[in-house]
Swiss-Prot record:
Presence of the UniProt keyword Ubl conjugation in the record: no
Keywords: Electron transport, Heme, Iron, Membrane, Metal-binding, Mitochondrion, Mitochondrion inner membrane, Respiratory chain, Transmembrane, Transmembrane helix, Transport, Ubiquinone
Similarity remark: Belongs to the cytochrome b family.
Gene, per the UniProt record: MT-CYB
Gene3D superfamilies reported for this sequence: Cytochrome Bc1 Complex, Chain C
Cofactor details (free text): Binds 2 heme b groups non-covalently.
A Gene Ontology molecular function term of the record: ubiquinol-cytochrome-c reductase activity
CDD domains on file: cytochrome_b_C, Cytochrome_b_N
Biological processes per GO annotation: mitochondrial electron transport, ubiquinol to cytochrome c
Protein name in the entry: Cytochrome b
Protein residues bound to heme b b566: 97, 196
Species for this entry: Mustela altaica
Required cofactor names: heme b
Length: 379
């Protein structure tokens, strides 16, 4: 009798995706982040669902409802901080996942890569709208500043901003719609993640060598299920250490002050995971130029496959490209630091140089270095 796991229409899909899936025998821990992102998404949906049961999306009561969750709801504080810090863990895993894709040439699977970029935009939009919901000072002013960027769009800009706001400023209508979108987007992200996996399973996983691994496959279960469980334990341990010992480490103290349209905080800045993009936005004096640079800082990933000039897929055996890659990582860390600094003399210049270097590495230096490496190897 054939195993029901392999024949039943429902279990067959699960079996072919997570159990009998042929996987390369040499994929490293850098391939764990896909499953970790799935776990992050599940944690965020579950904690978010329980928060939504007690949260009220009204300007008069939003801040108080979050306080009520932390003080009066059973284990409300842990749910709230798991959700807030879960977002940080989500973005750490996202950045490492994208970095892995860049390093090992996984972007050559163009459909998977492009769905991944759409997912990145969707997660960033969700996180931004979620940050507005507690209705603290940074929530209000962050929402005002970021939505205002759309007014840089010629001709329709101002009307577009007022349409998004549902009025002439960030107010009750804005908060209500942001809550609605923040609630629905994670489910859209789940569907997109399924499509992301669907396209990945059309080609099979890449591996650290960048060489096709069809001749050397192993079943996903038990080898990679156990490896993913280990990664998940590390993820949950890190998250719980953050939640239980320093839940406000990555947050902004200004968000514990209720939103006040008459009082602007001294330094308006987004959460840490947006600081690199915020630094790029601020480094260009023109409003429209800044907005375009901001969007292109993520959208640039879409043209990476077109700029792949190397004869090898992965950077494993390409030391010059490796140096450039780690320079890019250092540059992104610099941008993150600059994004959190005030707009003053040394920081402005550093931010502008780091922004230029970011685009230079991805669009100019990487393709040139790859050609040089090809010639060095006489390929």
């Amino acid at each position: 009798m054939t195993n029901i796991r392999k024949t039943h229409p429902l279990t067959k899909i699960i079996n072919n995706s997570f159990i009998d899936l042929p996987a390369p025998s040499n994929i490293s821990a850098w391939w764990n982040f896909g499953s970790l992102l799935g776990i992050c998404l599940i944690i965020q949906i579950l904690t978010g669902l329980f928060l939504a049961m007690h949260y009220t999306s009204d300007t008069a009561t939003a801040f108080s409802s979050v306080t009520h969750i932390c003080r009066d709801v059973n284990y409300g504080w842990i749910i709230r901080y798991m959700h807030a810090n879960g977002a940080s863990m989500f973005f750490i895993c996202l950045f490492l996942h994208v970095g892995r894709g860049l390093y090992y040439g996984s972007y050559m699977f163009s459909e998977t890569w492009n769905i991944g970029i759409i997912l990145l935009f969707a997660v960033m939009a969700t996180a931004f709208m979620g940050y507005v919901l507690p209705w603290g000072q940074m929530s209000f002013w962050g929402a005002t500043v970021i939505t205002n960027l759309l007014s840089a769009i010629p001709y329709i800009g101002t009307s577009l901003v007022e349409w998004i706001w549902g009025g002439f400023s960030v107010d009750k209508a804005t908060l209500t719609r942001f809550f609605a979108f923040h609630f629905i987007l994670p489910f859209i992200i789940s569907a997109l993640a399924a499509v992301h996996l669907l396209f990945l399973h059309e080609t099979g996983s890449n591996n650290p060598s960048g060489i096709p691994s069809d001749s050397d496959k192993i079943p996903f279960h038990p080898y990679y299920t156990i490896k993913d469980i280990l990664g998940a334990l590390f993820l949950i341990l890190t998250l719980m250490l953050l939640v239980l010992f320093s839940p406000d480490l990555l947050g902004d103290p200004d968000n514990y002050i209720p939103a006040n349209p008459l009082n602007t905080p001294p330094h308006i800045k987004p959460e840490w995971y947006f600081l690199f993009a915020y630094a790029i936005l601020r480094s260009i004096p023109a409003k429209l130029g800044g907005v375009l640079a901001l969007v292109f800082s993520i959208l640039v990933l879409a043209i990476i496959p077109l700029l792949h000039t190397s004869k090898q897929r992965s950077m494993t055996f390409r030391p010059l490209s490796q140096c450039l890659f780690w320079l890019l990582v250092a540059d992104l860390l610099t941008l993150t630091w600059i994004g959190g600094q005030p707009v003053e003399h040394p920081f402005i210049t550093i931010g502008q140089l780091a922004s230029i270097l970011y685009f230079m590495i991805l669009l100019v230096l990487m393709p040139i270095i790859s050609i040089i490496e090809n010639n060095m190897l006489k390929w």
